[in-house]
Amino acid sequence: MLPSTIQTLTLFLTSGGVLLSLYVSASLSYLLYSDILLKFSPTKRTAPTMSLDCANVSNVQAVNRSATKEMTFLLPEPEWTYPRLSCQGSTFQKALLISPHRFGEARGNSAPLIIREPFIACGPKECKHFALTHYAAQPGGYYNGTRKDRNKLRHLISVKLGKIPTVENSIFHMAAWSGSACHDGREWTYIGVDGPDSNALIKIKYGEAYTDTYHSYANNILRTQESACNCIGGDCYLMITDGSASGISKCRFLKIREGRIIKEIFPTGRVEHTEECTCGFASNKTIECACRDNSYTAKRPFVKLNVETDTAEIRLMCTETYLDTPRPDDGSITGPCESNGDKGLGGIKGGFVHQRMASKIGRWYSRTMSKTERMGMELYVKYDGDPWTDSEALAPSGVMVSMKEPGWYSFGFEIKDKKCDVPCIGIEMVHDGGKETWHSAATAIYCLMGSGQLLWDTVTGVDMAL
């Protein structure tokens, strides 16, 4: 008896009394990736029916005039993604600039879209550059209103990372004035929020299908994180918030699987105001987020979400390096870690990404160089420790955007190499033309690579007067 791992296929073709036997043997093996067994699904292939118009031959008693054969092959399904150790490196370097409006003289399909709130998310095989467009291009006649955060024309769009977000290159995913996206290893999940301020709606798209919604719970600008959501083992976690920009705004997390919400997570702890979180995996067990408090403090609310228990807790970062803008002088806030201090009204989304190593963990952050304006962007790092209790200053690691250039929202993401993940930080560099002209953004990207010092800052190269 043949072993079960060997399949023998015998195909008999009879034509003119000639017998042909073809033997095909195939062996199956189990593949291991990150200690996770790959899953296989049976896929049937049926050979087509073929008519055999053969002449009668005297020494052939019977001729099969048709032949069919059903064969079953086992094909591997794409695997869910899990966080891995970071690729080796000790410093970030300038990786890429996407400055669409350097091509502002182009017209028609080659014209750059007017965008804001860019972010990047990566799957196993590609990264996508997302943004929220005003459904307008530059040059064009629809500049009025492109400085507004919310309107009926805004859409979540994407291009392959490295492409310029032009009319022709961009994929329009859904109507949205707030957005997120992530890849679970098998498919993309897209998140878009739009609707009136008092009754906004979260919409979820999985691949090409619109799959689920989530309604406003505080009736005050339901919104999401403006950066990538985070997936592990097929479950994707999305931060949302709903509430006043200058008062209470309590966040939640949605657990999403294949485009459908399967659980709501209600954080505990310091929950007064949490929005625009930038999140990533500290380990296979914990998602951490550095967020924005637009009402009470210049310290960042810091979330720890346990993906095994689906519980989350929020406390303020204790470091004397305050990461929001505007902010007071570093170290000037007295009292316990939960003290708000002054200059807490207003804020900005901040960059944050993990460097996972075998023996320690690095947490990289970005903040504007100006304490009062959205100008410049500097990189900081802290190895090990607990952001909730460590009061020491973060270590400065280089200037990504000088004080002469705009530094607005920033975000973190990870590029998947073959055996490790590359941590990166992206920076939104806004061309702020005021209310009378176009208002759009470039994106600067810095990634962990090599050693030494961060060498060079980024400029957009755009003159709005041209």
Curated annotation (Swiss-Prot):
Gene3D superfamilies: 2.120.10.10. Disulfide bonds join C87-C420, C122-C127, C182-C229, C231-C236, C277-C291, C279-C289, C318-C337, C424-C447. Pfam families: Neur. It catalyses: Hydrolysis of alpha-(2->3)-, alpha-(2->6)-, alpha-(2->8)- glycosidic linkages of terminal sialic acid residues in oligosaccharides, glycoproteins, glycolipids, colominic acid and synthetic substrates. Keywords: Calcium, Disulfide bond, Glycoprotein, Glycosidase, Host cell membrane, Host membrane, Hydrolase, Membrane, Metal-binding, Signal-anchor, Transmembrane, Transmembrane helix, Virion. Glycans are attached at N56, N64, N144, N284. Residues 13-35 are annotated as: Involved in apical transport and lipid raft association. GO terms for biological process: carbohydrate metabolic process; viral budding from plasma membrane. Residues 89-466 are annotated as: Head of neuraminidase. One of its GO terms (molecular function) is metal ion binding. Its EC number is 3.2.1.18. Its cofactor is Ca(2+). Substrate binds at R116, R150, E275, E276, R292, R374. The keyword Amino-acid biosynthesis does not apply. Ca(2+) binds at D293, D324. One of its GO terms (cellular component) is virion membrane. It is found in: Virion membrane; Host apical cell membrane. The active site is at D149 (proton donor/acceptor), Y409 (nucleophile). Coiled coil: none annotated. Inhibited by the neuraminidase inhibitors zanamivir (Relenza) and oseltamivir (Tamiflu). These drugs interfere with the release of progeny virus from infected cells and are effective against all influenza strains. Resistance to neuraminidase inhibitors is quite rare. N-glycosylated. Intact N-terminus is essential for virion morphogenesis. Possesses two apical sorting signals, one in the ectodomain, which is likely to be a glycan, and the other in the transmembrane domain. The transmembrane domain also plays a role in lipid raft association. Belongs to the glycosyl hydrolase 34 family. Catalyzes the removal of terminal sialic acid residues from viral and cellular glycoconjugates. Cleaves off the terminal sialic acids on the glycosylated HA during virus budding to facilitate virus release. Additionally helps virus spread through the circulation by further removing sialic acids from the cell surface. These cleavages prevent self-aggregation and ensure the efficient spread of the progeny virus from cell to cell. Otherwise, infection would be limited to one round of replication. This is Neuraminidase. It comes from Influenza B virus (strain B/Singapore/222/1979). The lineage of its organism: Viruses, Riboviria, Orthornavirae, Negarnaviricota, Polyploviricotina.
